[in-house]
């Protein structure tokens, strides 16, 4: 990714970093789960041939991404993203109940819940991407108009800053592809269980619920 000098001011926008966090939680989760699901399933349910089933998750997430964008165009990216994060937190919490503990665990429940995570991560990556485009266009036009700029200038700068934001945030989201498998691996090495990593993910999704609601869920938000 390369940001030109004319696009550098976008790095000073608070919303760039907030939306990067939300996109990391959705798109990052999608590619991270895609990379780590088979490994996690194999360690928790070694008797199951997960290779025959692992591809369904990424497939569901990829289809859901397009659906998430389409739904957001109709109902609003903020609303869809908020509801989606709530479900991601719920599925993350349910995952604890499916893992082997004192018993052998429940693979069918584990698989079903994880498919739910793939679905919501895919939907969320589409809805947050739509949020980024809409919000950056709004705040850029507002900022230029407040400085006395013309409609043409506002539209031109909105295109430039939105494109820069989408490129930068997309790169941040890709970090999840590295972080999630590493988190699972570290938790397994330290405790023999993925529970530690899952607790971090659950807390992260709850934070994203609060962030989406408090910053973007209200009718007006700071235009900085």
Regions found by a protein language model. Give the residues of each.
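C-terminal transmembrane helical hairpin of 12-TM major facilitator-type secondary transporters
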Residues: 78-128
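Short, small-residue-biased leader/transition segments that mark boundaries at the very start
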Residues: 1-3
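Transmembrane alpha-helical cores of Major Facilitator Superfamily
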Residues: 24, 55-59, 86, 167-175
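A late C-terminal transmembrane helix in Major Facilitator Superfamily
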Residues: 146-190
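Extracytoplasmic gate region of multi-pass secondary transporters
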Residues: 13-62, 125, 129-130, 180-181
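Helix-to-loop junctions at the C-terminal end of transmembrane segments
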Residues: 65-77
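Intracellular juxtamembrane helix-capping segments at the cytosolic ends
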Residues: 123-153
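A membrane-interface helix-boundary motif in multi-pass transporters
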Residues: 184-205
């Amino acid at each position: 990714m390369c940001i030109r000098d004319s696009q550098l001011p976008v790095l000073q926008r608070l919303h760039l970093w907030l939306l990067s966090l939300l996109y990391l939680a959705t798109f990052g989760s999608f590619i991270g789960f895609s990379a780590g699901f088979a490994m996690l399933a194999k360690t928790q349910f070694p008797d199951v041939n997960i290779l025959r089933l692992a591809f369904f998750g990424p497939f569901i997430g990829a289809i859901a991404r397009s659906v998430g964008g389409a739904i957001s165009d109709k109902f609003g990216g903020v609303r869809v993203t908020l509801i989606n994060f709530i479900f991601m937190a719920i599925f993350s919490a349910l995952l604890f109940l499916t893992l082997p503990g004192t018993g052998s665990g429940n693979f069918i429940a584990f698989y079903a819940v994880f498919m739910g995570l793939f679905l919501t991560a895919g939907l969320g990556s589409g809805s947050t991407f739509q949020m980024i485009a809409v919000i950056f266009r709004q705040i850029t036009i507002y900022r230029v108009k407040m400085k006395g700029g013309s409609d043409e200038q506002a539209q031109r700068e909105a295109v430039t800053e939105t494109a820069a934001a989408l490129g930068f945030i997309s790169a941040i989201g890709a970090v999840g592809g590295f972080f999630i498998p590493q988190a699972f691996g570290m938790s397994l090495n330290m405790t023999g269980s993925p529970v530690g990593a899952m607790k971090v993910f659950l807390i992260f999704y709850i934070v994203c619920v609060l962030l989406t609601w408090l910053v973007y869920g209200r009718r007006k938000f700071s235009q900085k």
